[in-house]
Amino acid sequence: MAEPRRALAQMDDARISVGNARFLIIEAPYYEDIAAQLRAGAEAALTRAQARFDVVSVPGALEIPIALAIALDRAPALYQGAIALGCIIRGETYHFEIVANESARALTQLVVERKLPFGNGILTVETETQALERASVESGDKGGDAARAALALYRFSQEFGQVVEQAQIQAQRPVLTSGAR
């Protein structure tokens, strides 16, 4: 089996330091031990990047997009990014597909519409063993990966904003040309 690129896990957190930016972690601790590992990884990554963060819990993965929408509507300027954490383990019914697909769809739609730096740390797995391996800070660190994704997008938005400002300044300067031919 091919090994995934671990670029996010190997990213130097100091390189993506975000000063006082504030992030919202929304967790669905349906599986408490898995959620605790995801949260530990996310909090560690945010702390290393010198970000501030708040954590809220909701019952399940389907409630995460709704909670994020409420937070953004009630306090639109409070958060510069968000991280979703949770776990969906396949059972014997179609419910797995509904929860996995609809939570991902709703989150993607929301963060794209709002242009919000975001990291999705909602695991979708076949077994609890898979979930524990992926959530563990020592092995998979998917909570940390989700936080690093949000941090990287935040830095991108800041840096791209500076590029745009520089381009606008350049566009306003008069163009000097050499003499007429």
Curated annotation (Swiss-Prot):
Entry's Gene Ontology BP terms: riboflavin biosynthetic process
Binding site for (2S)-2-hydroxy-3-oxobutyl phosphate: E92, T93, R134
Functional pathway: Cofactor biosynthesis; riboflavin biosynthesis; riboflavin from 2-hydroxy-3-oxobutyl phosphate and 5-amino-6-(D-ribitylamino)uracil: step 1/2
Active site: H95 (proton donor)
Residues the record lists as binding 5-amino-6-(D-ribitylamino)uracil: Y30, A61, L62, E63, C87, I88, I89, N120
Molecular function, one GO term: 6,7-dimethyl-8-ribityllumazine synthase activity
Keywords of the record: Riboflavin biosynthesis, Transferase
EC number: 2.5.1.78
Superkingdom of origin organism: Bacteria
UniProt entry tagged with the keyword Iron-sulfur: no
Disulphide bond pairs: none
An annotated GO cellular component: cytosol
Recorded coiled-coil stretches: none
HAMAP family for this protein: Lumazine_synth
Function: Catalyzes the formation of 6,7-dimethyl-8-ribityllumazine by condensation of 5-amino-6-(D-ribitylamino)uracil with 3,4-dihydroxy-2-butanone 4-phosphate. This is the penultimate step in the biosynthesis of riboflavin.
NCBIfam families given in the database record: lumazine-synth
Family: Belongs to the DMRL synthase family.
Official protein name in the record: 6,7-dimethyl-8-ribityllumazine synthase
Species assigned in the record: Beijerinckia indica subsp. indica (strain ATCC 9039 / DSM 1715 / NCIMB 8712)
